Amino acid sequence: MNAIVEQLKSTAAATKATDLRAAFAADAQRFSRFSVALDDLLMDFSKTAVNDDILKLLVKLAEDGGVEKKREEMFSGKAINFTEDRAVLHTALRNRSNTPVLVDGKDVMPDVNAVLAAMGKFADEIRSGALKGATGKAITDVINIGIGGSDLGPVMATLALAPFHDGPRAHFVSNIDGAHIADILKLVQPETTLFIVASKTFTTVETMTNAQTARNFIAKALGEAAVQHHFAAVSTALDKVAAFGIDSARVFGFWDWVGGRYSIWSAIGLPLMIAIGPENFGKFLDGAHAVDNHFRKAPITENLPMLLGLIGFYHRNVLGYPTRAILPYDQRLSRFPAYLQQLDMESNGKGVTIDGTPVEGNSGPVVWGEPGTNGQHAFYQLIHQGTSIIPAEFMIAANAFEPELRHQHQLLISNVLAQSEALMKGRTFAEAKKQLTDKGMDDKKADFIAPHRVFTGNRPSITFVYDKLTPYALGRLIALYEHRVFVEGVLFRINSFDQWGVELGKELATGLLPVVEGKESAEGHDSSTQGLVAALAKLAK
């Protein structure tokens, strides 16, 4: 594998100098040769520097790097998350074929289906008004309390699928900052509100602090006995859930082989199911399952997650590009970049290989983005003319949900196509100068101004096109990126499924709380921390 990486690196200088304009001019079939599709989902990577030789090397990299072997280990239930001795089976949660999936010799599918059925029954009862609040009123608002994977997925997907909402209004609380829950509680009435507390262990500090605030909100307005009518939980800690006052019939579990950032397919998706209904939630799972099958069966050169991961690895570890921009041209996908930020950076932000040795080269990139066209008026300037190359990944649906606003969607499409073309083509000095002189500017001034209007071009982008942002399409898109992260992680030779970097800050915060509360001295902490504690204490009222 290292030899192939070195071969790729030996071409890096030439690759960076690749003139994509010339490549398209020389090859009328470049788009068709460097784009692949799964049904209506098209991935165009022709505007990257990938050529026939690089693609062959990338395919060899996947083969020699053991990506296919590791892929089968994941799907078959092997404990590939070896630092926690856990299988990685979020794919089982959307295994619509019901093919047995074994963990320690036991088929997990009966349990998966049982939880899904219980979720569906509960969601239907809330949506229909059969399950009411303590005063006999139907539930009109559902507030999910969670953080990280228990929040980012449900928030993102619920917003993305807004056209399919026909259930109670959905709200989400995650931050331990009291302002977050305070602002949400102002929007609802206690007698018509259901809280879902999402915490596997029922000990997550942020979640349980907010849950206690929510409990007080209900108990103060409706009495202690009302708590059981206004809460549900997604957890495996049944004793703690019961102590909180939540009926065991309203508790939905999931398993150690489901990582938080991969948990939207599990009971963590309950608020989404309540919003869009069990049938649409099933279609969401169907879309992901279609990508799972494609990922397992399609040849590497026709395999969307494989190609996306290989190109991502190439950009990061061969060409050295430190970030990637996720740019969905869909306002309802406004939280998708943040969702992928966690998925990618928590998975592949590692510095140690599976052998326990330091990673050679780079691991995961910084992932960020905003929906178009908002981003065009914020940070695209740097993507077009900055000194860092930032690979861009665009997404656009051919059809929107507002037929009366078709012209606006056409404007959206024209913008995303223009951006990918502009990044590729750029603008030469001669073109910039001619544009100025055509407007009447004299030669001397045009020579001075034109350099500021030059775009180097050759800036890589990938564009995804699909029919419409349905539950099926969203499930497909998420699964595509999940498997992309997996492919890159295998090539980085890291464990993509633990997150020890999250733990240190938690431990230190626990120790600092008594200091912040004034119960203990800051002595023993560094001088900066001591100084900050003192400054905050002085300002506190």
UniProtKB/Swiss-Prot annotation:
Entry EC number(s): 5.3.1.9
GO biological process annotation, one example: gluconeogenesis
Chief localization: cytoplasm
Keywords: Cytoplasm, Gluconeogenesis, Glycolysis, Isomerase
Molecular-function GO terms, alphabetical: carbohydrate derivative binding; glucose-6-phosphate isomerase activity; monosaccharide binding
Keyword ATP-binding carried by entry: no
Keyword Cytoplasm: yes
Subcellular location: Cytoplasm
UniProt cross-references to Pfam families, sorted A to Z: PGI (PF00342)
UniProt-listed SUPFAM superfamilies: SIS domain
Enzyme class, first EC level, given as a word: isomerase
Reactions the enzyme catalyzes: alpha-D-glucose 6-phosphate = beta-D-fructose 6-phosphate
One cellular component term from this protein's GO annotations in UniProt: cytosol
Pathway(s) served: Carbohydrate biosynthesis; gluconeogenesis; Carbohydrate degradation; glycolysis; D-glyceraldehyde 3-phosphate and glycerone phosphate from D-glucose: step 2/4
Catalytic residues (UniProt): E346, H377, K506
HAMAP family, per the entry: G6P_isomerase (MF_00473)
Function: Catalyzes the reversible isomerization of glucose-6-phosphate to fructose-6-phosphate.
UniProt-recorded name of the protein: Glucose-6-phosphate isomerase
Lineage, opening ranks: Bacteria, Pseudomonadati, Pseudomonadota, Alphaproteobacteria, Hyphomicrobiales
